Amino acid sequence: MVYNNPWNKIIRRSIKMLVSAKEMLQKAKAGKYAVGQFNINNLEWTKAILQTAQELNSPVILGVSEGAGKYMCGYKTVVGMVNGMIDELGITVPVALHLDHGSYEGCYKCIEAGFSSVMFDGSHYPIAENVAKTTELVKVCAEKGMSLEAEVGAIGGEEDGVVGSGECADPAECKMIADLGVTMLAAGIGNIHGKYPANWKGLSFETLDAVQQQTGDMPLVLHGGTGIPEDMIKKAISLGVAKINVNTECQLAFAAATRGYVEAGKDLQGKGFDPRKLLAPGVEAIKATVKEKMELFGSVNKA
């Protein structure tokens, strides 16, 4: 007698896996839209972004800085959480899990942990050393089926303690790095992380156009997407940007919504102190921000 275990079908079901960002970004570049990278900081952030991507049928990249990775206990914890959510939320859109502004050592840790994409930020190295380290990572990522982002020209502002002045990249250096076989290239074009100051001069489209001419079909990446005017975003996409990073804007929206909940005294009403209730307005604020960005970037219904 063969026992028919009703759980067998569930156990055998295929689980949607993390994907490299390569295919989604090549499609975006060809289709003149951009895929958003939204950085995650905890369970609520991750759930909000994944659910919004699924609702809008949009590909998405979950970014994890080295600082956020440490905050969430480590890269293996992050991979487990994201894979579990993709499965149990029934996420079917393409999802890449990407190390943001990774050190050389950080890239290897994420490769080992199961990320599907990494960024090696070698912009602070001399170009020869940047080339050598990037060349090595290109080979490793290709063997693992992962995507690799490289950077030329330091992005301004501060990213987990890494400070950049907002340089404009040298198009010739961009070509040198692109020719190594990276998946995508972040070129500094006057953009910065965090809030843009009142005296910000704007994006250098002259630099972006020159980089595009030098790198051809290479998907370009725009860091510091928070606060850049919509017309600049659209022009950047028209000049080859296929990936746009958003972090600060989600943080500001989450903080404002959470502050509003507490200041209204809702945490003192009934069981309003329950963290699931206290954090809910912030989660909805993240969803609204991600939706707005996906619509602006043109990635809706592009999964």
Which sequence ranges carry the predicted segments?
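Active-site proximal loops enriched in glycine and acidic residues that flank catalytic Cys/His/Asp
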Residues: 189, 224-226, 248
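Short, conserved beta-strand segments within well-ordered enzyme catalytic domains
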Residues: 37-39, 59-63, 96-98
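C-terminal alpha-helical cap/extension of soluble enzyme domains
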Residues: 229-303
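N-terminal amphipathic alpha-helix/helix-capping segment at the start of soluble metabolic enzymes
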Residues: 14-36, 83
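Alpha/beta enzyme core
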Residues: 23-25, 43-67, 77-92, 104-214, ...
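Glycine-rich beta-to-alpha transition loops that act as phosphate-gripper elements at the mouths
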Residues: 40, 97-103, 219-230
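Short gly/pro/ser/thr-enriched loop/turn and capping motifs at secondary-structure boundaries
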Residues: 68-70, 125-127, 250-255
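Short, Lys/Arg-enriched N-terminal segments with co-localized hydrophobic residues
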Residues: 1-16
